[in-house]
Amino acid sequence: SASQSAKNAKEMAVCWINLFGLQSLQTGEIGEANQREVEFNTFKVVEFVDFCCKQGFLPVVACTPLGCDLNSYVSDAFGDATLGGIERKMKERGVPFLNYRKDERFQSELSLFTDGGYKLSRRGSLKYMKILLADVQSFYETVINNKSLNA
């Protein structure tokens, strides 16, 4: 229900604030310790993407959708403070960073999530994977299907 989704989203936001010692998810101020973790995680993602590129793979970094209730607690400034470094590093490398966090196709359908907008339901996962696959194919200008995957 809509009221349960809103309640779950609020509980998740409060949980994240407490878990990471944040004042809010509405600001880019994440604190020194969290900033170090973000920088370390960014380094690891870049390291992995660079490895994939050297192996001849076509890497993609994606941020999954959040529902509208959960998105109401997370500002763009917070998103930039936590994911912006990865997004910028991928852009430098010509690797797609596909950010579906606020994707309109997921904002008004509660049935796409099993909770307040964080965990995709089976239906939400299928919808997301179809969108992701189409976007990856478009970015790399290649068809991805069972035949191409087994080549």
Tell where the protein language model's regions lie, with residue ranges:
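Histidine-centered active-site loop/cap adjacent to the catalytic His
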Residues: F113-N150
